[in-house]
From Swiss-Prot:
Protein name: Probable 2-phosphosulfolactate phosphatase
Leader peptide range in chain numbering: none
A GO molecular function held by the record: 2-phosphosulfolactate phosphatase activity
Record organism: Prochlorococcus marinus (strain NATL1A)
Co-factor(s): Mg(2+)
A family per Pfam: 2-ph_phosp
Key words, A-Z: Hydrolase, Magnesium
Catalytic activity from the UniProt record: (2R)-O-phospho-3-sulfolactate + H2O = (2R)-3-sulfolactate + phosphate
Protein family according to the UniProt entry: Belongs to the ComB family.
Root EC class: hydrolase
Iron among keywords: no
EC number(s) on file: 3.1.3.71
Length: 242
């Protein structure tokens, strides 16, 4: 199994459709997706464009949908929830389609939407995704970070390294293809005993802290291997627990 890591959507090669892709946005989109599906959401549909989201959401009855979105870490006007994993409680999302647009994560999902198998991962469902990849046994996996407005993010690289490290421990066939992933593995080894600390010193972590109290979000996003949910794209842009 060949593993590659791309820091942001723009780094993903053109004209190639990978066998399997894993998109990461630790703070906070893929953590929120995991918790929404864990808490009973029917599905999560992701949009890079807010207007497109609103138009598509109009086709659903109000009781069958919930709008989740942020820009710059703040809830979008007219949306039901922002991008906090704590907000997507069972009471809020159970049985509903979550229409979601965020600053960074939804762009990365859009970039690799044609992958043969597309999953989202956060630290809480790292082990579940690793087990699924072992079961699928693809020849090549692209791990794609979300970054912040097109630039590198520490926390996504931490999670990429965490996934790769776990797969390397369990599979002899794993091959690390690029230096980006090798560096991410080293990052994980350095911070694996203080995951929340790494999230807090990251520039995006500092940005979140600067706009309000996100202590509970940090703790949630830093939790490791406590969810078994596997968000998988079942149709273009739509994720469901698989």
């Amino acid at each position: 199994m060949k593993l590659s890591y791309f820091y942001v959507a723009a780094d993903v090669p053109d004209g190639i459709i990978p066998e399997s892709s894993v998109v990461i946005d630790v703070l906070r989109a893929t953590t929120t997706i995991a918790w929404a599906l864990e808490n009973g959401a029917d599905s999560v549909q992701v949009f890079a464009d807010v207007d497109e989201l609103k138009n598509q959401a109009k086709t659903f009855d109000s009781k069958e949908k919930i709008l989740v979105g942020e820009r710059g870490g703040k809830k979008l006007d007219g949306f039901d929830l922002g991008n906090s994993p704590l907000g997507v409680s069972s009471e809020s999302v159970k049985g509903k389609r979550v229409f979601m647009s965020t600053t960074n994560g939804t762009r990365s999902l859009h970039r690799v939407r044609e992958s043969k198998s597309l999953y989202t991962m956060a630290l809480p469902n790292r082990k579940a995704i690793a087990e699924r990849l072992k079961s699928d046994n693809p020849k090549e996996v692209w791990i794609v970070g979300s970054g912040w407005e097109g630039s590198y993010s520490l926390e996504d690289s931490l999670a990429a390294g965490a996934l790769a490290s776990l797969l390397m421990d369990q599979l002899e066939s794993v091959q690390i293809v690029n230096d980006e992933l090798m560096a991410s593995i080293a990052l994980w080894k350095n911070w694996e005993n203080d995951v929340e600390g790494c999230l807090r010193i990251a520039s995006h972590g500092q940005r979140l802290a600067g706009i309000g109290n996100h202590d509970d979000d940090f703790a949630c996003c830093a939790s490791l291997d406590n969810l078994s949910v596997i968000p998988k794209q079942i149709e273009m842009g739509v994720l469901r627990s698989n």
